[in-house]
């Protein structure tokens, strides 16, 4: 019988997102703006981030508590040296049923074959525009679109399942919604639109910059009619729509206008080993200290279970009602991978 660990709102622990680095080769303005994360920014030193042994150990502990799906994140996870070896090790952990990776795609062409051989079956690529100048601006002048598209193609050629994530910001890239939808419909990859969220502390988020799920769907539906379809599984964050008369689909992740806190089953481990129970958390619990002490697996398991049992995060549900309250500092998305 599979273990089930529930929080105070009866949400099970099923998914673990593991950040393997806090570094990124992009400077996307909603995530790691150049003016904050510049040449003098102090990233974690190698001795501060979890080793592969520690990541494998913590994975086994979370699996014993009910986790079945892993997602490797960053920063940009493909900057972590030897990542295919980690994927291979995690793929052998008894109880792990699925491993995914989120990447900006700029290094994917190089690593796709080794990642697939290691057991990585699916990848999510962040891509906010197909327009060259706009994409270059949005990523902090770090990469051209073609480099990312070549990475997507390389992943497809080795057999990976691919999803594309587009963060939509009013006044920045909402004019690219239709072009993105058409392109990835033709290329048979699922495109997911993400409402611009108030993650971290430095992106200057304002509600007026959010393009809502309904606006996105209406815009596409006028040109390529859509119909809503059922979720693949309980707790899926994206609302799914298929193109009428086609097998292709899109998804919309609506953390702002139609939150899904009630079904959130995700825990997040930062690169230095802190456990966060919400994407918008203001503080985490230090598991690295336990991993590097004389704590046994059983003792760490008890600590993690207690943290999850006491979880009652529902930030997105409360966002608008708390809009006039003083904002608490939040963990940076670049630190825990979204």
Curated annotation (Swiss-Prot):
CDD domains: Radical_SAM (cd01335), Twitch_MoaA (cd21117)
Biological process annotations from GO: Mo-molybdopterin cofactor biosynthetic process
Residues reported to bind GTP: 17, 71, 102, 163, 266-268
Residue sites binding [4Fe-4S] cluster 2 per the record: 261, 264, 278
GO molecular function: 4 iron, 4 sulfur cluster binding; cyclic pyranopterin monophosphate synthase activity; GTP 3',8'-cyclase activity; GTP binding; metal ion binding; S-adenosyl-L-methionine binding
Matching SUPFAM superfamilies: Radical SAM enzymes
InterPro entries assigned: Aldolase_TIM, Elp3/MiaA/NifB-like_rSAM, MoaA, MoaA_NifB_PqqE_Fe-S-bd_CS, MoaA_twitch, MoCo_biosynth_MoaA/MoaC, rSAM
Cofactor(s) named in the record: [4Fe-4S] cluster
Record-linked Pfam families: Fer4_12, Mob_synth_C, Radical_SAM
Organism superkingdom: Bacteria
Transmembrane annotation, as ranges: none
Record note on cofactor: Binds 2 [4Fe-4S] clusters. Binds 1 [4Fe-4S] cluster coordinated with 3 cysteines and an exchangeable S-adenosyl-L-methionine and 1 [4Fe-4S] cluster coordinated with 3 cysteines and the GTP-derived substrate.
NCBIfam families xrefs: moaA (TIGR02666)
Biological function: Catalyzes the cyclization of GTP to (8S)-3',8-cyclo-7,8-dihydroguanosine 5'-triphosphate.
Subunit structure: Monomer and homodimer.
Name the UniProt record assigns to this protein: GTP 3',8-cyclase
Native species: Bacillus anthracis (strain CDC 684 / NRRL 3495)
Taxonomy of the source species: Bacteria, Bacillati, Bacillota, Bacilli, Bacillales
